[in-house]
Amino acid sequence: MSMPYDNEAKIKQAVILLQKIVNDTSVPRNIRRAATDAIRNLQDLGLSPAVRAANAIGILEDISQDPNMPTHARISIWNVVSILETVKD
């Protein structure tokens, strides 16, 4: 019964963490752009929570291998992916 709320809370937490990456000027622009795209996917209410999470995970996994990514940003992205992997319909 409380599953939809839990999913939305997880998505909201992921968006907050991604927003920190977007606002961090020490993170390369392409990585901040990918984080912005992931946020946009997570906020698309036309899709189910699991689909939104899967779309964002795809974007974040692609960018997480970037050799120019600072370590703190990579760890944050891994944390976001871990949160989003628990979102189920």
Swiss-Prot record:
It comes from the Archaea. Signal peptide: none annotated. InterPro entries: Ta0600-like_sf (IPR023130), UPF0147 (IPR005354). Belongs to the UPF0147 family. This is UPF0147 protein SSO6503.
